[in-house]
Amino acid sequence: MTMETLPKVLEVDEKSPEAKDLLPSQTASSLCISSRSESVWTTTPRSNWEIYRKPIVIMSVGGAILLFGVVITCLAYTLKLSDKSLSILKMVGPGFLSLGLMMLVCGLVWVPIIKKKQKHRQKSNFLRSLKSFFLTR
């Protein structure tokens, strides 16, 4: 491919429908504004529900799946069922049990991580305000 044909190829690509979907180049400041973690850049306080919503949902779903697994496992060992149903229940019960326990533990571990992030964010905001106080004088 020669240098003369390269710009023509680019012109054809710019007219394609995919070129309309491409974003224009952004500066660093506009990238910060459109970043996913926009809450880092805003100073509005968030409620506890907004902060801990995801771990609470994960723990609730994990607890429900764990309870379902316990019930199925208990039924598999207490009921007199056919061999086929019994073998299915003995496989599915512990599967739900372990999945629920895993989700419950993930939610429980997530809470201290969020608390640590909140403390770090508070310290960061304090240091930022202290820095701006001394720099404006």
Curated annotation (Swiss-Prot):
GO terms for cellular component: plasma membrane. This is Phosphoinositide-interacting protein. It is a multi-pass membrane protein. The keyword Nuclease does not apply. Pfam families: PIRT. Keywords: Membrane, Transmembrane, Transmembrane helix. It comes from the Eukaryota. The keyword Iron-sulfur does not apply. GO terms for molecular function: phosphatidylinositol bisphosphate binding; phosphatidylinositol-3,4,5-trisphosphate binding; transmembrane transporter binding. The chain crosses the membrane at residues 56-76, 94-114. Interacts with TRPV1. Regulatory subunit of TRPV1, a molecular sensor of noxious heat and capsaicin. Positively regulates TRPV1 channel activity via phosphatidylinositol 4,5-bisphosphate (PIP2). Binds various phosphoinositide, including phosphatidylinositol 4,5-bisphosphate (PIP2), but not phosphatidylinositol (PI). It is found in: Membrane. GO terms for biological process: behavioral response to pain; regulation of sensory perception of pain; response to heat.
